Amino acid sequence: ALDKNAAVLCSDTIPARYAFTNAHLFKGEFEPETVIAVDVAGLQLFGEGNGVPRYSRHVDLCIDHHAGNSGYADFTLLDGTAAAAAELMYRVILEMGVDITPHIADCLYTGVATDTGCFRFSATTANTHLVAAKLIEAGCHVEELNTLLFDTKPRARMEAERIARNHLEYYLDGRCALIYLTRDEIEQTGVDPADLEELTSLPISIEGVKVGLTLRQQPGGSYRISVRTAKGVDACAIARRLGGGGHNRAAGCELLGNLENAKNAILAEVEAELDAPQEDA
């Protein structure tokens, strides 16, 4: 729209279901005039894949909604009250005077809907719904997108979910539920690693559970841990003590060592948080 070349780079492989969002963008290597990071709260979260470190050494602008953003970029557009980074992108596009085409609306709606769990997460605000409404007015294909994003699961993802459910464990008098997948199990199913993000909602959906944990072994052997919590329990505080971060109700960290060590480390922090005086989170 502004006659500029743009490319999207992500350390992880972008899932096939999101291919429509960047199909028209530049492909290949080039020397960017400006590097912009979106929805990345700290340098350690960029990852090492797909040549990302070449570009993340110097970031000109960061657009983010994580209150704990480390301020690594030259300039930062930060709103910790926004439920999704795509809400901020919507504002930026309007300020730039760009017309929101149906394709742009599809991309922004995808960001808003996925970051809010289809508008179910506690961070969702009236403004989130207003932005979604404006995107629908602009021509986004809301029915098709919701079906693609929330009602369609690859078979490999279903197999991974079956295995994870079989590993379901309860701790701390049922206040904490945990599921996990080893690297062998992930490779056995052939599941797209990005589809595993959807597993994080399983343990916290169980009645009576205050903290839901999902552990996924990474190619190097470490365990990526996703923390989801009920109202009044600070997920970010749990993850932060282990070098991670995130939001009040959704956070994560990564731990070296075997499965039992990872379990013990995260459960110790969960117990400490659950036994501490709680405020609404």
Regions found by a protein language model. Name each.
Residues V35, D60-C62, T76-L77, G212:
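Short, well-ordered beta-strand core segments
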Residues A1-T13, R17, E31-P32, T114-L242, ...:
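Hydrophobic helix-and-loop "lid/oligomerization" segment in the mid-to-C-terminal part
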